[in-house]
Swiss-Prot record:
It is a single-pass membrane protein. GO terms for cellular component: chloroplast thylakoid membrane; photosystem II. The gene is psbX. It is found in: Plastid, Chloroplast thylakoid membrane. HAMAP family: PSII_PsbX_1. Keywords: Chloroplast, Membrane, Photosynthesis, Photosystem II, Plastid, Thylakoid, Transmembrane, Transmembrane helix. This is Photosystem II reaction center protein X. It comes from Thalassiosira pseudonana (Marine diatom). GO terms for biological process: photosynthesis. Involved in the binding and/or turnover of quinones at the Q(B) site of photosystem II (PSII). PSII is a light-driven water plastoquinone oxidoreductase, using light energy to abstract electrons from H(2)O, generating a proton gradient subsequently used for ATP formation.
Amino acid sequence: MTTSLANFIASLTAGALVLSAIGIALIIISKNDRVQRS
């Protein structure tokens, strides 16, 4: 595996981790935030 390919895969993995972390946080917040919307 070349260095550039390793860096590319690492950046993809990091991006996926960040996106999943944000998504999980939003889901938790939306579940806990029981604001009455008219």
